[in-house]
């Protein structure tokens, strides 16, 4: 009898345990299902974020590439514009240089023509207004020669020419030598270096290398100075008196003075 009671109790307890076990299984399964669903959502969110990040990086990369390409195009355009500008400036400078040379050549040609015309006018009229020399002077080659109507010592002659912004006659080139021989000058002081001894020698091109007189003027009263007599050079006391002839460089012939001096029928 007691065994039946014990069996009955065990049987009663088993259904309770079974029910508890079933409840426990249901709760555990529910929790496990919820956790799995939450993990799936998290994974999906992460995947979505990664996808968005990848898309964002792609968009940024595209923007960067487009911007870089645009800037490169602008840079190339600026470089081409700079090169074109430099080339245009170079061509303009070259054109201006060529024009300047042409103008310079034309000016030189006009100057040469004006000088030739003026020489022709001067040969007919010694005091023609185109003459590039002071009034009363003689124009020969590129120099003007003025014979002063006075006598003077060598030092006085130097000072007299200096007062006219000219210099005492000096044989410094072939043109001066030709002028002296052409004029057959007599007893005119020359701008030669004073000497301590009296001498003479023929007029020649060797005189081109003579030293300038201004370099030695101390005790000039005790020295000898040179003068020209036709084709010879003589030395006498610097305190003696001789004729004076001054020399200065001729100015440029003015084209207007030549044109105004031409006859009406030749213009």
UniProtKB/Swiss-Prot annotation:
Originating species = Mus musculus (Mouse)
Per the record, the major location class is membrane
Q: What is this protein called?
A: C-type lectin domain family 12 member A
Instruction: Identify its membrane topology class.
Output: Single-pass type II membrane protein
What is the recorded phenotype of mutating residue 118 to A?
Answer: Decreased localization to the plasma membrane
Which GO cellular component term is one of those annotated? cell surface
Motif extent (ITIM motif)? 5-10
Per the record, ranges on the Extracellular side are 65-267
Which residues span the membrane? 44-64
Outcome of substituting residue 7 to F: Abolished phosphorylation
Protein's cellular compartments: Cell membrane
Positions carrying Phosphotyrosine: 7
Q: Which gene encodes it?
A: Clec12a
Say yes or no: keyword Glycoprotein present: yes
Its tissue distribution reads: Mainly expressed in lymphoid tissues. Preferentially expressed in peripheral blood leukocytes; less frequent in thymus, spleen, heart, brain and lung; and undetectable in other tissues.
Q: What GO annotations for molecular function exist for this entry?
A: carbohydrate binding; pattern recognition receptor activity; protein phosphatase binding; signaling receptor regulator activity; transmembrane signaling receptor activity
> For this chain's UniProt record, which GO biological process terms are given?
negative regulation of dendritic cell differentiation; negative regulation of inflammatory response; negative regulation of natural killer cell activation; negative regulation of neutrophil activation; positive regulation of type I interferon production; regulation of immune response
What does the subunit section of this Swiss-Prot or TrEMBL entry state?
Answer: Homodimer; disulfide-linked. Interacts (when the ITIM motif is phosphorylated) with PTPN6 and PTPN11.
User: What Gene3D superfamilies has UniProt attached to this entry?
Assistant: Mannose-Binding Protein A, subunit A
Task: State whether keyword Phosphoprotein applies.
Answer: yes
| SMART domains in the record | CLECT
Report the gene knockout effect.
Answer: Mice show hyperinflammatory response. Mice undergoing collagen antibody-induced arthritis show enhanced and non-resolving joint inflammation due to aberrant neutrophil function. Neutrophils exhibit significantly increased neutrophil extracellular traps (NETs) formation in vitro following monosodium urate stimulation. Following plasmodium infection, mice are protected from experimental cerebral malaria, accompanied by a decrease in the frequency of brain-sequestered granzyme B-expressing T-cells.
**What cystine linkages occur within this chain?**
118-130, 133-144, 161-246, 225-238
Cytoplasmic topology ranges: 1-43
Maturation and modification: Phosphorylated at Tyr-7 by SRC in the ITIM motif following ligand-binding, promoting recruitment of tyrosine-protein phosphatases PTPN6 and PTPN11.
Q: Which UniProt keywords apply?
A: Cell membrane, Disulfide bond, Glycoprotein, Lectin, Membrane, Phosphoprotein, Receptor, Signal-anchor, Transmembrane, Transmembrane helix
